[in-house]
């Protein structure tokens, strides 16, 4: 019995010491909670909320929430969002999946220790290759938007149009993308062209 306990504790210690253990636990839990315990969201463009709180493990040397933590919290919220609106299920039905191809973050005000916040996630639209999502970190103390993140979720194995059509049972025209998002997409395309030219891969497309 004691040997089993030691082995179990050793495996748990190795899991959290060698891997990003809490992340690997939280994402599946968020997906299962969204699938089993929360109602389905029929409106693809509806905003969804994911609650959080700044913990000691989230802090940087200035005792603010580490900038990298915003991306991780947004990742968990995005997984729950895509589950509730049915996108992940549709991708699975079509034998496809998505990968994060690009992201950008704008930090407006620090989140401090134990400060409660919500991640407001919404789908902004899609093109022939990717979905575009936004995550806003809103402080529950005063409603201030502390950070704004944008994501390009590239679809592999099918197209965003087919995913939406599978969900809605009809063809749906994508909404007009915000002007600032269009500029970001242009930046990504220009950056890709420059990097491909530097690598001698001008005919190869990025994700």
From Swiss-Prot:
Subcellular location: Secreted
Assigned keywords, A-Z: Glycoprotein, Phosphoprotein, Secreted, Signal
Glycosylation site residues: 188
CDD domains: 4HBT
InterPro entries: HotDog_dom_sf, THEM6_lcsJ_thioesterase
Residues carrying Phosphoserine: 199
Signal peptide: 1-21
Gene Ontology cellular component annotations, sorted alphabetically: extracellular region
Protein family: Belongs to the THEM6 family.
Name used for this protein in its record: Protein THEM6
Protein species of origin: Rattus norvegicus (Rat)
């Amino acid at each position: 019995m004691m040997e089993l306990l030691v082995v179990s504790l050793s495996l748990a210690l190795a899991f959290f010491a060698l891997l990003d253990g809490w992340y690997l636990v939280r994402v599946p839990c968020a997906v299962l909670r969204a699938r089993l315990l929360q109602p389905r969201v029929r409106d693809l463009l509806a905003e969804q909320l994911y609650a959080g709180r700044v913990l000691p493990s989230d802090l940087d040397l200035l005792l603010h929430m580490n900038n990298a933590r915003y991306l991780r919290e947004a990742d968990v919220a995005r997984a729950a969002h895509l589950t509730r609106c049915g996108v992940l299920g549709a991708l699975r039905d079509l034998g496809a999946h998505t990968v994060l191809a690009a992201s950008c973050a704008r930090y407006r005000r620090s989140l401090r220790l134990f400060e409660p916040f919500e991640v407001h996630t919404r789908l902004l639209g899609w093109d022939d290759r990717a979905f575009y999502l936004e995550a806003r970190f809103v402080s529950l103390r005063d409603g201030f938007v502390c950070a704004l993140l944008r994501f390009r979720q590239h679809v592999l194995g099918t197209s965003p149009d087919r995913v939406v059509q599978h969900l809605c049972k009809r063809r749906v025209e994508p909404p007009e993308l915000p002007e600032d998002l269009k500029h970001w997409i242009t930046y990504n395309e220009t950056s890709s062209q420059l990097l491909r030219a530097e690598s001698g891969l001008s005919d190869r497309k990025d994700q």
